[in-house]
Every structure is written in C-alpha cells, then in structure tokens.
Amino acid sequence: MDKSFILNKTSSRSLARRGQLFTAHGKVETPVFCPVGSQAAVKTLTPEDLKSVNINMILSNTYHLYLRPGIPIIKEMGGLHKFMNWDEVILTDSGGYQIFSLANLRKLDEGGVSFRSHIDGSTRYITPEDAVSFQQDLGSDIAMVLDECPHSEASENEVLAAMERTHQWAKRCLAAHTLKIQHLFAIVQGGLSPELRRQSAEYLASLDFPGYALGGLSLGEPKDITFETVRHTLRFLPENKPRYLMGVGAPEDLLEGVSCGVDIFDCVLPTRVARNGAFFSRLGRLNIRNAAFATQKGPIDPECNCYTCRNYSAAYLHHLFRCEEILAYRLATIHNIAFLSNLMQEIRTSIEKDCFEEFKADFLSRYQPTNEAIRIEQKQKWLFGRNGEPPS
C-alpha cells in the first residue's frame, strides 16, 4: 500500500512523533498501544468493550492460532476479522518469539524451525514462507516476519547467528509476501549489542519494508538498557516508516518509548496484571486486594471515567477479587485498557501541542513505578508461560 504512514509532527525537544498509519481496516493514530488478543480474544473483553474505550487496533498471535483452532478453519470462516467479529485493525505476530521460548522443545536450521506443540506434543515445522502464508490466510492488516529471538543469556556469537538468520528469513518472507493490502514488518534483532543493532537496522532498512519492529527487548534486562538500545537502534531506521517496540506496555515505559521515537506498542501487561488485581492509576498500580479498599465508597481511580469507575466502588471490586468472581477480572481489564487508551490520547495531544516533555514530566512526578527488582522477577516468570505453555 502506498503512503501507508504519514508523519504529522515531531516534538521540538525530543524524538516523540505524531503520525497516522493507514490499513485495509482503517486509520490508526500514532503513537498507539495495542492490547493483546493472542488467541483471537483480548482476555475477558468483547470487541464492543474495546471500541468503547477507543481501541481500534489489537494484536493476535499466529503461533497460538496455528495450533488452535488452525489456520484453515479461520480462513474458512472468512478470515480473522470475521472469525472474532472485529472490524478494526489487527496486527499478527509471526509466533517466532513463542516458538523460540520453547527452548528444549524446538530445533532450528537455515530452512526454518521445528518444535513440539505444547498442546498435544506433535512435531511441527514452520518456514519463513509458512509464517507469511499463515498470516495472509488470517487476513491481518499488519503481519510480521519470522525471526529468531535469542535468549537473554545468549553469547555474542549466538546473538550474531540469530541476527544473520533473522536477516535471511526476512528476505524470504518479503519474497513470499503477495497480499498487497497487508503491511509486512521486519524485526530488528542484535541483542543488547549497539553494533549488531546498527547492522540489523541498516540491513533491514535496505530491504524497504513498510514498517520495522524492535524485537528481543524487554526480556528482563534493566529498563535503562532497554531504552538505551531502543534510542540507538531507531537512529538507523527510516523516519518515514512506523517503528514498533514489541512487548512494552507499562505507563512509564510507553512514555519513555514515545520519547525515543516509537510509534506502536503492544503488551499483555495491562490485561495480565488486571487479572491479578492490579489497577493502573495516575499514582501507580493499586492492589485492589489491599484492606484499605474494603470500605472505599468511591471508585478505585477517581480520575478515571471508564465503565468500571463510573459504576462500581472500590469496595465492590475488592469484594469480587476476594471471592474470585469472574466479573472481577473483566472490570479490572476494562479499566486498565481504558487507562492506557486515555494515556496514549493525551500523549498524542501533547505532541500536537509540542508540550510532550512537560506532560511526561508531570505524569512521572506523580506516578510510582513498580519496584524494579520485583518487575524483573515477574518478567522472568512470565517469559516462559505456565505449565510449559509459551507466553502470549
């Protein structure tokens, strides 16, 4: 698609960008956060719920959909949009990260990767061409190349080999891609090495993809290293193409990513922590299970106008979580997605008015981030899913 991304404004004092991404299912205002619906559903929410909080772009995962219900079934149902009754924008991940998180359950060669299904133990083999074909059959608006994501403790030689294989697979994905109304994004790898990140970004930029993602980050490394790598890598990517930082979704990280020049984010964080009783607020995450909320008559977040905060007291939400009522997870998820949607709208407005830096400083002056040691510990647990299942 021609002119699929328009850059409207750049901050005068940072690299923050305001743009518009055009797809077959509509326009996306950037910077944007995408909720994750790995298995064709954002957990606990309906499409109407998402639209009610101004979400018009979500992510689904090809790995999970390939295994269950299967790409042919979704294609027979008219594609992923019709299958899940979502008429807005869908980005599909190739599933590379999920496959490589299987560790001892997978083997790879130059042709592709073989792995054992975490569902039934069957052996599967996927090539870069398969990954493209699957996503074309799904009919997503944005598809991702198959890449190799090296593990966080990989040696420099292993990171180099993964980067070079990612480059070769990217070329093959580009050659196999024929669905003109679908954008195919490349994925920059290179670990935490500034030199390898430069090489990867420059090589993939030379192939002229419609957009570029930064993979292999936010895998448990300190945040300052994450964003130092992001800032460095983006210097070597074209300014007229969208930049996508995979797996980042904490409010403070969205602000930092935007200041680096990132346009698109996705993460399971808001939905996952919601199901654990954590509500985003301007002051930081609030644990609804705390006894202090047992008698609070007002909403959990007085500054929020979402469905949950308009209709339910913190005391009621506390009760639902203590009783493990399913409604608790739904109401918490609505709130967290609404919070991030509103935050991104405020970020976009601040860039338009060229006051993003003031907005960021004001937000962070009140917001209390999660303890870094606890965050890294949680991240390491989440990276490998549960019961042998790869992460979402």
Curated annotation (Swiss-Prot):
Output the Gene3D superfamilies linked to this UniProt entry.
Queuine tRNA-ribosyltransferase-like (3.20.20.105)
Q: In which pathway does it act?
A: tRNA modification; tRNA-queuosine biosynthesis
Q: Region RNA binding: which residues?
A: 247-253, 271-275
- Active site per the UniProt annotation: 93, 266
**Domain of life of the organism encoding this protein:** Bacteria
Q: Name one GO cellular component term.
A: cytosol
- In the UniProt record, does the keyword Metal-binding occur? yes
* Annotated residues for binding of Zn(2+): 304, 306, 309, 335
Co-factor binding details: Binds 1 zinc ion per subunit.
Q: Name one GO biological process term.
A: tRNA wobble guanine modification
Q: How does it assemble?
A: Homodimer. Within each dimer, one monomer is responsible for RNA recognition and catalysis, while the other monomer binds to the replacement base PreQ1.
The record's function comment reads:
Catalyzes the base-exchange of a guanine (G) residue with the queuine precursor 7-aminomethyl-7-deazaguanine (PreQ1) at position 34 (anticodon wobble position) in tRNAs with GU(N) anticodons (tRNA-Asp, -Asn, -His and -Tyr). Catalysis occurs through a double-displacement mechanism. The nucleophile active site attacks the C1' of nucleotide 34 to detach the guanine base from the RNA, forming a covalent enzyme-RNA intermediate. The proton acceptor active site deprotonates the incoming PreQ1, allowing a nucleophilic attack on the C1' of the ribose to form the product.
| PANTHER family, per database record | QUEUINE TRNA-RIBOSYLTRANSFERASE
Name this polypeptide is given: Queuine tRNA-ribosyltransferase
Q: Which organism is it from?
A: Dehalococcoides mccartyi (strain CBDB1)
What lineage, starting at the top, does this entry show? Bacteria, Bacillati, Chloroflexota, Dehalococcoidia, Dehalococcoidales
Gene symbol of the encoding locus: tgt
